[in-house]
């Protein structure tokens, strides 16, 4: 199992200072000293996908690859919005559509203070948003039948415009197949859609 992410450059870190210095060098027509350009990063990303595929690591989520049968069960449960309880200081949980986390203050945690912090009962809209933008991170996509079972409204009715737009742009595809309780439609991001997933997934957030 391999998780492959591009490095996020955060402010107030040595990498951020180096990246800023590289930007000045690039602007002057020079060769960066520290970090690759966006174009180089995309080539590295493409090469990573190809090398992993050659060695039997199939992509099952935007940034995760595994050999068959070795997908991370914890992560899959997270993307499918299954219940999970976080154990430990600062750990997050999702239980019966309520999100919360443990204290991140060591003194309080050592007193066995297990009071929920920042508890949020998710609205139906928030649940539908999470269903889409978490589920579409997986290459299996999202099931319209499961959406209906959970929310009692057709996925296509809620997200008609977003689906139409992304499919017309070649970022999303729909496939049909047999399910245990009848026919099912699954929506998946295309390879291009995965490459611009931040844009594609944002279409499923309610204004």
Predicted regions and their residues:
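C-terminal scaffold of the Radical SAM
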Residues: 1-153
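Short solvent-exposed loop/turn micro-motifs enriched in small/polar/acidic residues
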Residues: 69-71, 165, 180
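Non-catalytic, well-ordered alpha-helical scaffold segments
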Residues: 126-133, 160, 194, 198
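Helix-rich C-terminal "collar"/helical-bundle subdomain used as an assembly and partner-interaction module
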Residues: 147, 171-174, 187
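Short amphipathic alpha-helical interaction segments
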Residues: 153-168
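A short, conserved structural fragment
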Residues: 167-181
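Minor-groove-contacting beta-hairpin "wing" of winged helix-turn-helix DNA-binding domains
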Residues: 180-190
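Short, amphipathic alpha-helical interaction segments positioned at domain boundaries
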Residues: 191-207
């Amino acid at each position: 199992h391999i998780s492959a992410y591009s490095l996020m450059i955060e402010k107030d870190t040595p990498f951020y200072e180096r990246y800023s210095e590289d930007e000045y060098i690039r602007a002057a027509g020079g060769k960066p000293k520290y970090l690759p350009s966006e174009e180089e990063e995309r080539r590295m990303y493409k090469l990573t996908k190809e090398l992993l595929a050659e060695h039997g690591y199939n992509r099952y989520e935007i940034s995760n690859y595994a050999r068959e049968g070795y997908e991370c069960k914890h992560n899959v449960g997270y993307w499918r919005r299954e219940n999970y309880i976080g154990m430990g200081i600062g750990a997050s949980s999702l239980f019966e559509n309520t999100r919360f986390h443990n204290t991140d203050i060591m003194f309080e945690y050592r007193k066995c203070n297990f009071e929920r912090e920042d508890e949020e009962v998710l609205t139906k809209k928030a649940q539908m948003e999470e269903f889409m933008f978490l589920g579409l991170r997986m290459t299996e996509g999202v099931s319209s039948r499961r959406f209906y079972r959970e929310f009692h409204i057709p996925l296509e009715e809620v997200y008609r415009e977003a689906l139409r737009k992304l499919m017309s742009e070649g970022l999303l595809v729909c496939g049909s197949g047999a399910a245990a309780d009848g026919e099912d439609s699954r929506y998946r991001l295309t390879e291009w859609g995965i490459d611009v997933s931040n844009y594609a997934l944002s279409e499923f957030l309610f204004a």
